[in-house]
Amino acid sequence: MKTAVILCAGQGRKMWPYGATRNKAMLPVANRPLILWQVDALTTIGVEKIVLAVDYRQEQLRSLLDHDPRIAFVSAGGCNGTAPALLAAWSTLQDPSLLLCYGDILYTAEDLRALLRLHQERRRPATALLQPLGEEKPNEWLCAQVSGDRIEQVLGHPRDSVSHRFAGVFALEKSMLPFLRANPGRMEAIQVGMMAPDEAHLEASLQIALEADHEIGAAQAGATLQDLDKPWHLLQANYAWGRHLLQSMERSNMADTAKISKRATINGYVLIGANSEIGDGVIIEGNVWIGKNSRVVQGAILEKNVIIGDHCTVRRYAQIEEGSVIGDRCFIGHCAEVAGVLMRNVYAYHYGEYWGILGEACDLGAATVCGNLRFDDGQTVHQVCGHRETPLLGANAAYLGDYVRTGVNAILMPGVKVGPYSVIGAGALVNEQVPERTLVYVQQQQIRKTWGPERYGW
């Protein structure tokens, strides 16, 4: 297949607070927008033309990719679901078959090859990439019951009776078009007592094809594939992709203009870009990737599988914990301890502890700390668009949207989310979700009395 369609039109409400300021395909994974990893994987397997179906915050995608001759854009405005968005894109093409990818999926070229191999062997109307559910709850996903290499039944957010969930990548023949057009506008393949919204899912069209006695293929995705649906999935994707990139390193790679002090302790391989420096007393405890024009100096500690972007400073005994990704132009200073994902231009200037995701241009006041261990040793239950769920990873992490600022000694309790353009004032303790564009501060009652030398007998 030489043509792929990527659906990037949705608003991504479940990804709040990060979906409030960006298209989900622009979410950063290992310091690159997700869409670039997708384009890389598609071109690796020989795809020559990629059509992006866009609507919400499409200007971000156009700014990034408009210059690329492989990329075309089609408007999916007004399309309520993946099925009509695909029809809008396919109507601009002459291809009898194509690859379809959702814009919030992180996949490898190996995932795509496994899908195409099965599809080309069987030549069914459609073949879907699927992942075993494992510990995940089926009622949080569009799911399928699988037998061998084919789908037996599609079920939307079921309680049980399924083994796999859809992984957001499909190989499709033009013979699927009648079933796309026959989509009823909501998922009718649900269990009794469940409720489906008015949204035309592609997976509903697959069930219609099954009921018309067509076979639908089921290819298995690798463990690295990630579906970025909610904030903790972004955390999980960065951890998984960092391991994918760094654990396979077999030697260090140092740019000619980079510097590594002989007084640094390095227990792993280092990929370090031009004009970057690893200084005296630095401790590196595994494989790391440091970008261009960055400084890791003055006793900073990096645990394994850490990625640091371009133009960063990590200094004065700061600690970056295992698997963390630090975006471009971040500054992490004296005794600051961070874990998770920091997007571009984040400042944690000195002292504090943070675990979770910090959105673009966040500014942490001194001694901002995150509580991530509850007294009941439990995991925080999150509300996602009215649905209560407990993430498998990152339930007790903090999630600060873009442009959030905190004052000195701010305290963020386990699982807190703060919307973009918000401020948490000095000394405030935040234990519940903060909406975007909100100022939270402490109104302190003070008692004043006279004092002086006479109090000491003078």
Short names for language-model regions:
Residues 1-19, 442:
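N-terminal nucleotide-binding beta1-loop-alpha1 segment
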Residues 2-6, 28, 32-101, 107, ...:
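Conserved N-terminal catalytic core of the sugar/cofactor nucleotidyltransferase
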Residues 36, 83, 87, 270, ...:
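Glycine-rich phosphate-binding loop at the start of an alpha helix
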Residues 99, 113, 120, 150-246:
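Catalytic-core segments of class I nucleotidyltransferases/pyrophosphorylases
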Residues 101, 106-108, 172, 354, ...:
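Hydrophobic/aromatic residue at the end of a short beta strand that borders the catalytic acidic motif
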Residues 111-138:
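Conserved donor-nucleotide/metal-binding helix-loop-beta segment in metal-dependent transferases, i.e.
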Residues 199-201, 207-304:
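Extended, small-residue-rich solenoid/repeat segments and analogous flexible loops
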Residues 315-458:
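Glycine-rich hexapeptide-repeat left-handed beta-helix
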